[in-house]
């Protein structure tokens, strides 16, 4: 699963999930792409599940580009802990995805296989998505 090697700060603020992506919202590498239609956090597990689904359906054919990276640590407190005593420890990593951001791209496979594999990957995502073609 994806995670940064090192970060400047261990425990970032949660931030706001509003607005749309001003960069990374066009197809750059492949012929087909998955585009987010809503803002959301995508965990490294969800990214890996979508990548695996796409590569398995395409039978390791073609090339896949992952256009997002989980660089935000999400902290959690232990169960049944009293309030106070600081912020929790980092548990998992998420990519902050805004609406219209391209998540995955694919090239080198027929259109039917590309669309079918991307449709499976879309079900792994926590937001509404659509499939684009160059």
UniProtKB/Swiss-Prot annotation:
Its main location: plastid. Pfam families: Ribosomal_L16. SUPFAM superfamilies: Ribosomal protein L16p/L10e. It comes from the Eukaryota. Keywords: Chloroplast, Plastid, Ribonucleoprotein, Ribosomal protein. One of its GO terms (cellular component) is mitochondrial large ribosomal subunit. InterPro entries: Ribosomal_uL16, Ribosomal_uL16_bact-type, Ribosomal_uL16_CS, Ribosomal_uL16_dom, Ribosomal_uL16_sf. Part of the 50S ribosomal subunit. This is Large ribosomal subunit protein uL16c. The lineage of its organism: Eukaryota, Viridiplantae, Chlorophyta, Nephroselmidophyceae, Nephroselmidales. The gene is rpl16.
């Amino acid at each position: 699963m994806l995670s940064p090697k090192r970060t400047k700060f261990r425990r970032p603020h949660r931030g706001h999930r509003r607005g749309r992506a001003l960069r990374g919202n066009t197809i750059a590498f492949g012929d087909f792409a998955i585009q987010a239609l809503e803002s959301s956090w995508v965990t490294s597990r969800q990214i890996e599940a979508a990548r695996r689904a796409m590569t398995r359906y395409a039978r390791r054919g073609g090339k896949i580009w992952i256009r997002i990276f989980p660089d935000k640590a999400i902290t959690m407190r232990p169960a049944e802990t009293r309030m106070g005593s600081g912020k929790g420890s980092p548990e998992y990593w998420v990519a902050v995805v805004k609406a219209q951001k391209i998540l995955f791209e694919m090239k080198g496979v027929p259109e039917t296989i590309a669309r079918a594999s991307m449709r499976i990957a879309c079900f792994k995502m926590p937001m509404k998505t659509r499939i684009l073609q160059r």
